[in-house]
Amino acid sequence: MNRLPSSASALACSAHALNLIEKRTLNHEEMKALNREVIDYFKEHVNPGFLEYRKSVTAGGDYGAVEWQAGSLNTLVDTQGQEFIDCLGGFGIFNVGHRNPVVVSAVQNQLAKQPLHSQELLDPLRAMLAKTLAALTPGKLKYSFFCNSGTESVEAALKLAKAYQSPRGKFTFIATSGAFHGKSLGALSATAKSTFRRPFMPLLPGFRHVPFGNIDAMSMAFSEGKKTGDEIAAVILEPIQGEGGVILPPQGYLTEVRKLCDEFGALMILDEVQTGMGRTGKMFACEHENVQPDILCLAKALGGGVMPIGATIATEEVFSVLFDNPFLHTTTFGGNPLACAAALATINVLLEQNLPAQAEQKGDTLLDSFRQLAREYPNLVHEARGKGMLMAIEFVDNETGYRFASEMFRQRVLVAGTLNNAKTIRIEPPLTLTIELCEQVLKSARNALAAMQVSVEEV
């Protein structure tokens, strides 16, 4: 029997949620009730699979903690009042910390004036953010298209490249093994994990995947395309593969890819959705090699952990394909005033506080210590690697990685695996993480590995 709509039920549910939003604290009974509600609603109305995925943060069989609020720039508090050091960073969105006061203030001030744009009048913050990004980004990047997520920024980049190269008879994209560019149909065509791709096959035609970091394979793909008349329109890659397991290419790889693109007349699209905004010790990871892309994709941390926003920034030559008809690719909420306010404030904080340099310094210290732990526990840890505050610990197998995440959770440190490489646990904290909290994270990691070693020896 079909369920009939219920306005009364919807009204009661929304009123209950609004009451929760107004609360700053919960008593014990309210906490227990909220936990039960959230788990039940995820199971019945969101996706029960998410509950099983969160096995690593299971406490007492309840599938996981229910977050309540930010504890500080670098911590989260759950409904039970437990405070966690955030070493996951929302998969890289909290570069300037949780509820950074500068970002929150900018959004609140804009909210008091005009939350969303009219679509007809010119909105000043979109113009100012585009100008700011033109000044901030490397090379000749000049024009920005704004959207709401990293996947959308990649979609826009692919469409820009197609619109630019199709009249030139170039239709094929090169992506790389281990890549993650999102899960919408176009972005998924560039993503390289079969688990995400196979249910939606066939994907968009015209994508080739070559081994990441192998410039000879990239060169061969260009040469074969030239010989067969299937010339390459663009290369899309991450300077460091995030979801692939924080995979760093050999030094000079990006430079050589840039040379191939120039030689064969292809565009270079860099997906810095996760590596951008200071994460790796530079504002953009491509700056480590002084490489200048034709199209740059940003999102995640661009909104300061307060508002969702993505950006696709391109050179004037490439972006000009949209000049005659700016409605070829648009989005209703992209570049809205609240999101732009958050992005402008985020950039201001990153520059004023020199957070990219802090990421480099603290990241080097953390990584050295993680590598020492890897040497101490070679039967558990394969390798520790990373750049800046984008780090990973790769374990010997998936189960060992899951166990580490669970042990860290017990010690109130949030970590998680990477989407394309489950045995690799990412360490991706806010760039604002204090020295004291860095030391606590290292202490927790050492305790976690020691506990895991005892379990291994007891078997």
From Swiss-Prot:
Modified residues (N6-(pyridoxal phosphate)lysine): K300
InterPro entries found in the cross-reference section: Aminotrans_3, Aminotrans_3_PPA_site, Class-III_PLP-dep_AT, Putrescine_aminotransferase, PyrdxlP-dep_Trfase, PyrdxlP-dep_Trfase_major, PyrdxlP-dep_Trfase_small
Catalytic class of the enzyme: transferase
GO molecular function: diamine transaminase activity; identical protein binding; putrescine--2-oxoglutarate transaminase activity; pyridoxal phosphate binding
Residue positions binding pyridoxal 5'-phosphate: G150, T151, Q274, T332
GO terms for biological process, alphabetical: L-lysine catabolic process; putrescine catabolic process
Catalytic activity of the protein: an alkane-alpha,omega-diamine + 2-oxoglutarate = an omega-aminoaldehyde + L-glutamate; putrescine + 2-oxoglutarate = 1-pyrroline + L-glutamate + H2O; cadaverine + 2-oxoglutarate = 5-aminopentanal + L-glutamate
Gene3D superfamilies given in the database record: Aspartate Aminotransferase, domain 1, Type I PLP-dependent aspartate aminotransferase-like (Major domain)
Cofactor section: pyridoxal 5'-phosphate
Any Pfam family matching the protein: Aminotran_3
Keyword Coiled coil: no
The enzyme's E.C. designation: 2.6.1.82, 2.6.1.29
Keyword set includes Ligase: no
Keywords, alphabetical: Aminotransferase, Pyridoxal phosphate, Transferase
Associated pathway: Amine and polyamine degradation; putrescine degradation; 4-aminobutanal from putrescine (transaminase route): step 1/1
Similarity-based family: Belongs to the class-III pyridoxal-phosphate-dependent aminotransferase family. Putrescine aminotransferase subfamily.
Job of this protein: Catalyzes the aminotransferase reaction from putrescine to 2-oxoglutarate, leading to glutamate and 4-aminobutanal, which spontaneously cyclizes to form 1-pyrroline. This is the first step in one of two pathways for putrescine degradation, where putrescine is converted into 4-aminobutanoate (gamma-aminobutyrate or GABA) via 4-aminobutanal. Also functions as a cadaverine transaminase in a a L-lysine degradation pathway to succinate that proceeds via cadaverine, glutarate and L-2-hydroxyglutarate.
Protein name (Swiss-Prot/TrEMBL): Putrescine aminotransferase
UniProt organism field: Salmonella paratyphi A (strain AKU_12601)
Upper lineage: Bacteria, Pseudomonadati, Pseudomonadota, Gammaproteobacteria, Enterobacterales
